[in-house]
Amino acid sequence: MRRAKQLAADSCTRGVFVAATDTGVGKTLVASALVKCLTQRGIDVGVMKPIETGVSRSRKAQSDGVRLQNAAGHCDSMAEVCPYVFRLPVAPLSAARAEGKTIQMATIMRAFNHLHQKHAYMIAEGAGGVFTPINQSLDVLDLINQMKLQALVVGESGLGGINHALLTLDALRRRKIPIVALVLNQCRPAHTKTARLQEQSTVSLLRRLAGIPVVGPLPYNPNMKKNWNESVVRFAKTAPIKKLARLVLASGQGRFSQPG
């Protein structure tokens, strides 16, 4: 715990928001592995998934919020870790409307601020891409701004990944949100020569064009869902995640820095 106190006192960096170029590109994997890596370094990490959709009663134990909390290894209230949970697997605005609810930024920020005060470092995970609407007037970009966190962008390493990544980075920059890194994830196996060529092209061009560190690509793991916790532990020990941990801890000196 001594190291956690040093982080809060000596560094302006207090957290990162794991955003994505799209849904299903590996946000929860990257966030969970990063949480595990930081906690293994003795850093007290708080986690949050402000909004999660597609959580049926039978799937609660496998929800993103629970997986993040398991990676952190603490017992914060799930009502704070994930203030809004909806059944339908659709955008937050639609999922909330289907249940006759409205997502309130104030509710999310109360939970975030409480967790932020308890922990030396916060990792929050978004829902979908950065323009995903969370209510009638706000989107995920507004959420990142409210939390005053740096962004960590997760994207796909295959075909189409270049456009999605550059659009996302541009959107964040237009809102003056600091970006730590772009993490590329192999969402599908690259079995064919063409698929491997496409991935190599995507990664190479993004390293040239992104203007920020590009980490990965993280390899495709077909057994991830069956052995989630074990996979996260393994990923946390890999060179890309260790590099990511160094990047997030070394950054954060911009306008979103918060006192310890």
Language model features with spans:
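Short, basic, low-complexity termini and linkers enriched in Ser/Thr/Gly/Pro
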Residues: 1-11
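C-terminal lobe/tail of nucleotide-utilizing enzymes
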Residues: 2, 170-260
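N-terminal phosphate/diphosphate-binding loop that engages ATP/GTP or pyrophosphate donors
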Residues: 15, 29-102, 106, 113-114
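Hydrophobic anchor at the beta1->P-loop junction of P-loop NTPases
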Residues: 18-19
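Conserved glycine(s) of the Walker
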Residues: 25-26
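Short internal beta-strands
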Residues: 49, 152-155, 180-186
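Phosphate-binding/switch loop-helix module in NTP-utilizing enzymes
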Residues: 91-134, 141
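Inter-motif core of Ras-like GTPase G domains
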Residues: 135-158
